[in-house]
Structure formats: structure tokens, C-alpha cells
């Protein structure tokens, strides 16, 4: 073998070695980069898991705050007819301390449309007696005292009702406060997937409601609602609700209840909103 050929061979071997070294170095860098990427992804996943937002739900009204609540109820009883009602209520936060919050509320307007057993009844509190038919005038005589009454409602930071007083006193009037903040908050912080239950009794019916956190975003918490009804009526309910985290105000809610009572099947859908004015 000539010296020239030997020199070429050495050069080729040297080049191949350099290429091999370069390939190995490239693989090393690629693997190193991949490992860094995997490590970074794992760290981000771990951070996301530990940094999942948890919130503490409490009522945080301020004295002199004013809120308007709208409640829309649609009731269907199949062939027996149905009813729709829209109500607006204004509430003023009259006092606040560490233990309780006092609200003064007044029903501002009520609109009812009813069709039961072929009998049609319409009532609008914004209309005068002259603008209402005979049935509407009868309903006006029943609702006028309600529109003139003031409801004094005391609640704690968890949303539990401590006391309800109506002036002048009207039986059943306290039921009109039900749509303002019907959620009882848990003691602990909650995050997505958290759930808790509350119980209430209303006119002979016991309602057990389960709230599950569906989402937390932009200062709001979204809840899925499910529940069971027992007592003089039996049934189920489902719905959704949105709560402002900073104030604890239930800004909107939709609840559908299917109820059987005294041989009558009913479907009730209640939609409520509450906003600061």
C-alpha cells in the first residue's frame, strides 16, 4: 500500500471518527434537550396540580350595598295547566358584623299568568285596578300588602338564615327571600370537583341539595346542583349556579324540579339573578 493511499485511509478514518463523534454529540444534545423538555413538562404538571385554585366561599356584603333580585318561575302540570311568575325585589344591606348580615328587602313588582282547569288569570302589579280584569283585581287585593311590606332578613357568613321578620306581619311572606342567596357554603375551601350538601325544609317538604364545583374562572365559581325532595311531595332537582367569589353573591341560578304531590305531577323551573346596583 502506498504512502499516499495510507494517508487517504487515515484521513477517511479520521473523518469518519469525527462524523461519528459529531453524530454521538448530536444525539447526546438531542436526548439532553428531550430530557429537559420532559422534565419541564413534569414540573409544569406538578405545579398545576399543586397550584389548583382553591377558594373560600363566604358572604361578604358591605353596609349600604344595594342589590336587585329577579326570579322567574315556570310551573307545568300537564293537562291541568300551568303558571308563570316574574318577581323583582330590591335589597339593602343595613348592617354588617363578623357574625351576621342584615338585609332589608321589598318586593317591587310581580307578574303572574295562570291557566288552570280552563281558568285564565293574569296579574301585573304595575297595572291599576282599572287595567285588570276581575280575577286580576282579586289577586291585586292579595298582593298589595306584600308589595307594601318590608322583609328583615339576617344571615351569617355561610349563607344560613338566622332570622326573618316581616313588617307588617304577613304569613308566608318570608318565602319571598328564598331566591336571594339560597346556598349554604361549606366551612372548608373548595376547588374543582369539590362537593357539599345542605338541607332545608319548606312547607312540609324536605330538600337535600348537593353542590359540586364545576369551574373556577375570572373571579366566579360555577356549581352543578342536584337534589332530592321528600315529605308531602317527592321528586328530584337539577340545576346550575354561578357565585361571585369576592362577595359570595349567587349572581344567577337555574333549577329544574320534577315533583309529585297529592297525585299531581309538576315540573317547576326557577331562574334567578342577583346583581349589585
Task: Give the role of each language-model region.
Residues 1-57:
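Bacterial Sec-dependent N-terminal signal peptides
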Residues 7, 138, 143, 253-262:
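A short, charged
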Residues 23-25, 173, 232:
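Short, aromatic- and cysteine-enriched interfacial helices/patches
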Residues 52-121, 194-277:
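Acidic, serine/threonine-rich low-complexity disordered tracts
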Residues 106, 112-146:
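Mixed-charge, low-complexity intrinsically disordered segments
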Residues 141-218:
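Solvent-exposed helix/loop surface patches that form functional interfaces
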Amino acid at each position: 500500500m502506498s504512502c499516499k493511499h495510507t494517508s487517504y485511509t487515515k484521513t477517511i478514518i479520521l473523518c469518519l471518527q469525527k462524523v461519528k463523534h459529531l453524530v454521538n454529540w448530536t444525539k447526546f444534545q438531542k436526548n439532553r434537550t428531550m430530557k429537559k423538555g420532559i422534565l419541564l413538562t413534569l414540573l409544569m404538571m406538578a405545579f398545576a396540580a399543586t397550584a389548583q385554585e382553591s377558594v373560600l366561599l363566604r358572604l361578604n356584603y358591605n353596609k349600604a350595598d344595594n342589590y336587585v333580585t329577579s326570579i322567574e318561575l315556570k310551573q307545568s302540570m300537564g293537562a291541568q295547566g300551568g303558571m308563570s311568575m316574574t318577581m323583582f325585589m330590591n335589597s339593602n344591606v343595613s348592617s354588617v358584623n363578623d357574625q351576621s348580615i342584615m338585609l332589608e328587602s321589598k318586593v317591587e313588582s310581580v307578574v303572574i299568568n295562570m291557566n288552570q282547569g280552563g281558568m285564565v288569570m293574569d296579574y301585573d302589579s304595575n297595572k291599576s285596578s282599572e287595567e285588570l280584569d276581575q280575577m286580576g283585581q282579586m289577586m291585586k287585593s292579595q298582593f298589595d300588602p306584600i308589595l307594601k311590606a318590608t322583609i328583615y332578613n339576617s344571615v351569617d357568613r355561610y349563607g344560613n338564615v338566622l332570622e326573618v321578620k316581616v313588617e307588617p306581619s304577613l304569613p308566608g311572606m318570608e318565602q319571598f327571600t328564598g331566591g336571594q342567596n339560597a346556598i349554604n357554603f361549606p366551612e372548608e375551601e373548595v376547588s374543582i370537583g369539590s362537593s357539599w350538601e345542605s338541607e332545608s325544609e319548606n312547607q312540609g317538604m324536605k330538600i337535600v341539595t348537593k353542590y359540586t364545583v364545576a369551574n373556577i374562572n375570572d373571579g366566579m365559581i360555577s356549581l352543578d346542583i342536584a337534589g332530592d325532595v321528600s315529605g308531602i311531595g317527592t321528586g328530584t332537582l337539577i340545576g346550575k349556579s354561578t357565585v361571585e367569589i369576592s362577595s359570595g353573591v349567587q349572581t344567577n341560578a337555574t333549577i329544574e324540579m320534577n315533583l309529585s304531590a297529592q297525585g299531581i305531577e309538576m315540573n317547576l323551573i326557577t331562574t334567578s339573578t342577583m346583581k349589585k346596583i
